[in-house]
Amino acid sequence: MKHPLKALVPLLAVAVLTAACNPFTPRNTPTAAPTQYPQDPRFAEFVYKSDETPTVKDRTDSINIRWPNAKASEAHVVVEYSPALAFIPAQDPEFWLTAVATIPDETIQLLAEGEATDTLLPGIYPHLYEYVPQECKFTTIDPEFADKALAPDKEKIPHDFDPMDIQALAVSKDCHLLVFTALGHS
């Protein structure tokens, strides 16, 4: 009876060590499975990745300099570089931005013309969800229209704020909020 127990102990030890070293187990990193983030059914999936842990910053300049017609009075922004693709040399580094900004009536009226079919809110960095009240009603705006309306002359953007293209945008008239994602290359 002692022999089966002696054989079982080493097998259990191997099983425990193997499970601890499983490379397919999600880790708490920015590139891990999206289940690590808060969930909110109002938003599209957050698809951007970074080698760094994204940080939410309060920066109106990041919005108002790149998109001068936004005229944001408050902005919660995440800007990060996408993971580098080592096999593609001489590629300009890609970076992404997700934001929630407070905007005036003037900006809302400017964007109203670009109303598109309503869909989910843009897939912003999930730690920005807290800045989007549940009671806000949103209208989806065509990204190309929004880009041209908010930044009519991208050549005038200072070089230390690389221009970006809006990927998805929604505006709330009742809450004076702009929720959007953008991509750029530096």
Give residue spans per PLM region:
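Mature extracytoplasmic domains of secretory-pathway proteins
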Residues: P68-F145
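Bacterial N-terminal signal peptides that target proteins for export
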Residues: M1-V9
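Bacterial signal peptide processing site
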Residues: N22-T25
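Extracytoplasmic low-complexity, Pro/Thr/Ser/Ala/Gly-rich segments
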Residues: T29-P89
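C-terminal motif of bacterial Sec signal peptides marking the signal peptidase cleavage site
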Residues: L17-A20
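Secreted/processed peptides and extracellular or luminal domains of membrane proteins
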Residues: R27-N28, D142
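Extracytoplasmic electrostatic interaction patches
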Residues: L121-S186
